[in-house]
Regions:
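Glycine-rich phosphate-binding loop plus the immediately following alpha-helix
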Residues: 104-129
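Glycine- and other small-residue-rich loops at beta-strand/loop junctions that grip anionic moieties
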Residues: 101
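N-terminal glycine/serine-rich phosphate-binding loop of ATP-dependent small-molecule kinases
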Residues: 1-98, 110, 122
């Protein structure tokens, strides 16, 4: 007997929590899980989060929601994230290079302005889009 893949799970990896919600084929919420996240402000205007905790909270939210509905029923996973929040990961180890720089952080405008003045903007746009 085959099982219908009739569930879509949406992960909202937000600033304050990672939340996964399972929807059935009629758009009804049938399961959900949320894990709170912490924000750090190590200096005035800086906003960052632990990249490892963002990943762990997201994986936990997905895992618990999948467990509630049964993996065999899941057709797809949709992911939304925190705007321009950035995390770099080491390819070899899978560890974060640094904390996640939040979209709320204001530490980089002066650096970006300097790069523009030095003529690097076209290259950066070509590489990053």
């Amino acid at each position: 007997m085959s099982v219908n893949k009739d569930i879509i799970i949406a992960l909202d990896e937000g600033t304050t929590n990672a939340k996964a919600v399972a929807f059935d084929s009629h758009g009804r919420v049938i399961a959900q899980f949320s894990r709170a996240l912490e924000i750090a402000t190590p200096q005035e205007g800086w906003v960052e989060q632990s990249a490892e905790l963002l990943l762990a909270a997201s994986l936990e939210a997905i895992s618990r929601t999948v467990a509630a509905v049964g993996a065999e029923r899941v057709a797809a996973l949709a992911i939304s994230n925190q705007r321009e929040t950035v995390v770099g990961w080491y390819r070899e180890t899978g560890e974060a290079i640094a904390p996640a720089l939040s979209w709320q952080c204001s530490r980089t405008p002066a650096f970006c302005h300097k790069l523009r003045k030095q003529g690097h903007e076209p290259r950066i746009k070509a590489v990053t889009g």
